[in-house]
Design a protein with these regions (language model features):
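Structural signature of tandem alpha-helical TPR/SEL1-like repeats
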Residues: 326, 374-382, 409-419, 443-451
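Hydrophobic face of amphipathic alpha-helices that form TPR/SEL1-like repeat modules
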Residues: 335, 399-407, 434-441, 467-470
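Short solvent-exposed coil/turn linkers within tandem alpha-helical repeat scaffolds
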Residues: 337-350, 391, 460-462
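Short helix-capping/linker turns of helical repeat alpha-solenoids
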Residues: 391-394, 407, 426-429, 458-461
Length: 471
């Protein structure tokens, strides 16, 4: 990748750049030193101080029973198989099948009460598989026995909403991890070109929301009760087969890559043409691996395998974890996979490489004005957000942008625009719309129209109130 020259700066900025570089080297060195020694030659995985794994709680809702022609045969198998996979990963699982709105809300409220009573660092997993719909920019989880093609007012009256009834119902857990998985499907290929689908959302702090397909695009379910849907089938497979060491965040990115590969190589042409590409909205604060920690009293249990097979592997992983510039991340991840093909962290390295390669390509584009200096740490700028953004995390990129926005203490229009351009290019329709509103405020109507159009292409529908303020 070519290095874009930074914009000319006054000589007084030289000292500031030097200090920033020094802070960056100190931070990266500390990260590398900690990671290099963690987990080598020992069964103990680097982890925050804890005597045992925090509770793992899950609620699975699967609605198969819809009016004739709209039923979803794979859904009950989805729930059975996912429940078994989650239980093997240490989850206590509740489930509900073919629930109407009242029953689904009651199940979710009971689950939320259980979550509130658990430790604040618990891992929480909500799953819905059934029909989904979007009305007035709101994502709806369609109740059993309701026609998903019913009038909008009927759907609103009879369905759960993803934001109000699920995400907002579950307590905020910045010290824990909340995962919501929405596998909203249909079985008919005749509807796939209709442009229908769910809306883009942003995850609250501590939360990861995974959709089976991108905003505005349908997910197709096989008309066969002996098969899983494409997304849940991949999720179950990777829950069972992935290394214990990878994080839940990386798991869902591996699922995304796997589903994309399956769809793009599917023998049915129409499925290839309208391939579902999973969508992830993430704002997690901690990293939690797939395998739970041993119980505190398990002193006689066999030790877990060492995280790294050698000091070289530990050092190479430390260097990869500390990198923030996409081209460097891609190079280090490629080298790691080449030098340590059997690493327990190879899945995480694959995720880092895929995200960084996409990010590096985007940063070469003329319509993304973001340079390497933007990835250097700065006072008050969360370093973990830069790390995520360098790996192609569209939501982290948007959060970095807002550190430079009009209401931020460090307002910098150039950085604000550049980071939002980058987030939009990574697929963040909300960031694209935010940039359109910014350009409208500063009287650049052509750019405003361009990014508003881009937001809608990405499947983002602004709420009616926000849309009205724009006009």
């Amino acid at each position: 990748m070519k290095n874009h020259p930074a914009r000319p700066r006054p000589a007084t900025a030289v000292l500031t750049r030097t200090l920033r570089r020094r802070r960056w080297l100190q931070w990266a060195g500390a990260c590398a030193a900690a990671a290099q020694t963690a987990g080598f030659g020992s069964g103990v995985r680097a982890q925050p101080a804890a005597t045992s794994e925090p509770p793992r709680l899950a609620l699975l809702i699967g609605n198969r029973d819809y009016p004739e022609g709209e039923d979803l045969p794979p859904i009950h198998k989805n729930v059975r198989d996912l429940r078994a996979a989650l239980e093997r990963r240490g989850f206590e699982v509740d489930q509900g099948l073919d629930l109407d709105q009242a029953a689904a809300r009651a199940a979710t409220a009971a689950f939320a009460a259980k979550v509130r009573a658990a430790r604040p660092d618990a891992t929480v997993f909500f799953y819905f598989s059934g029909h989904g719909a979007q009305v007035d920019a709101e994502n709806l989880l369609v109740s059993a026995r309701i026609n998903p093609k019913a009038r909008p007012e009927t759907l609103v009256r009879t369905s759960m909403t993803l934001t109000r009834d699920v995400i907002n119902e579950l307590p905020r857990r910045p010290a824990g991890l909340t995962i919501a998985v929405i596998d909203a499907c249909r079985t008919s290929l005749r509807d796939v070109a209709g442009g229908e689908g769910l809306n883009q959302v942003e995850a609250p702090s501590g939360c990861l929301i995974a959709f089976a397909t991108g905003a505005g695009r349908p997910a197709i379910a096989p008309a066969d009760e002996s098969r899983n849907t494409f997304y849940t089938g991949s999720l179950v497979k990777l829950l069972e087969d992935a290394s214990d060491e990878i994080s839940f965040s990386d798991l869902f990115r591996l699922v995304k890559l796997d589903v994309q590969n399956v769809m793009l190589n599917h023998p049915v042409l129409l499925l290839r043409q309208f391939a579902q590409f999973p969508f992830i909205a993430e704002n997690t604060q901690i990293s939690r691996r797939l395998a739970p920690l041993p119980e505190a009293d398990a002193a006689t249990a066999a030790p877990a395998p060492a995280r790294f097979a050698s000091r070289d592997e530990a050092a190479d992983w430390a260097a990869l974890e500390a990198a923030v510039w996409p081209a460097e991340i891609a190079r280090l991840a490629t080298d790691f996979l080449k030098n340590h093909p059997k690493s327990r962290l190879s899945g995480s390295a694959e995720v880092a490489r895929a995200g960084a390669l996409e990010a590096a390509d985007i940063l070469r584009r003329r319509d993304v004005r973001l340079f390497r200096t933007a990835f250097q740490p700065a006072e008050g700028l969360p370093a973990n957000e830069l790390v995520k953004a360098g790996r192609g995390d569209k939501d982290a990129a948007a959060r970095v942008a807002r550190n430079y926005g009009r209401n931020a203490s460090r307002f910098d229009a150039s950085r604000y625009e550049g980071w939002l351009q980058y987030a939009a290019a990574l697929g963040n329709g909300i960031a694209s719309y935010e940039l359109a509103l910014h350009y409208r405020r500063v009287e650049q109507p052509l750019l405003a129209a361009q990014f508003e159009s881009r937001a809608r292409e990405l499947g983002y529908t602004p709420p009616p109130s926000l849309d009205n303020t724009r006009k």
